[in-house]
Amino acid sequence: MTKRKQQDTKENLTLTVFESNKRCSNSGGEYFDRIPADLVIKILSKLSAKSMAKCRCVCKLLSSIIRQPNYNQLFPIKYPDPPRFIFTFLGGGMLFSYTSTQPENPDENSSLVATAHHHTDIPRDFSQILSSVHGLVCYHRKIKNDTVFVIYNPITGQYVTLPILEAHATINYFAIGYDPINKRFKVLCVTSVHHGTGEEFDSQHQVLTFETGRRNLFWRKIQCRRHYYTHRYHKGICIKGVLYYAATSMKPMLGPMIVCFDVRSEKFGFITWKPPSLINYKGKLGSINSNDNDLVLWVLEHGQERKWSKHIYVKPLQWPEFNGIDVNFLVTSKGEAVFCPNHYDPQVPFYLYYYNLEENIVVRVRVEVPESQGSKRVLFHAVPNYLENMKLT
């Protein structure tokens, strides 16, 4: 006689366990007990996000464990060792995702071998990658006259299309942020609605809470006490639960500034500043600017006064000449600056440039990636210190 009972694990996970007078046996006549739920969870916690994604298809038990609402407590996201880059290439109607380790002490002989994860068919009207945080990437595309935003997981290859925003609204800024306390992703969108033919318009802020497995996603309007113009193509950056992006106040006396959106409280703050490029510098908000002879790094120090510290680095002789190429500034967890182009030609070797600020040395590192077929010019997006995530499952 087989009995069924509910067993509660320490992780507040309820599983159905079968009790029988007979234990399971294999063909050799040996008997074995069923694997306890807590041991299953411990085994799963050792797997990578890519392997765990495959386990969802093994059986309903594994799928239910991985899809639990308290997934972040059962399987906390860990930074890989050594740190890795995630590369997302767009070309030929395909979206390719690769990862590679970050070199510990790069030199001219260093090379990064990218490991392929997924390639996803995307529409030809794909526009650009907007932002990335905590393992997820956000991009947008056009469907007729509507702009549609998509959240994409490069490791699992899954994506979710977000609800279409209000018609007749101009989208000024869009980004995804992460609340590390409540373990939640939120999407912020700033839109404006013009009145008649004049320059007057209403600015609106909307937030969407992105939760695993939730079907009825919707936008909520929130209040912001200050009116400003956003820098539409500025991607911004999320650091420790705060989303930073560039803007300009509508009041001429205030001028350029940085908007600080607290993902958890959904409150706005403002810093008067003209940021050429925002970076995450060792867990602090940074701003970097390249002049003819030097590189200027500004770091926002912690504290109520929000003071900026300034660091000037004279460019070494081996400084690369990008000759008008659109370059993205990145910073590794060790504080090394990394320069990479936003586009590249698959027929030409692709390089990243590491700049050691302390030793004032620039090293060129080749990235070996498979050629993307059918495309002569590829949109490139790189994220340092990447961590795996199982969201969108």
From Swiss-Prot:
Residues 29-74 form the F-box domain. InterPro entries: F-box-assoc_dom_typ3, F-box-assoc_interact_dom, F-box-like_dom_sf, F-box_dom. Transmembrane segments: none annotated. Pfam families: F-box (PF00646), FBA_3 (PF08268). This is Putative F-box protein At1g55070. It comes from Arabidopsis thaliana (Mouse-ear cress).
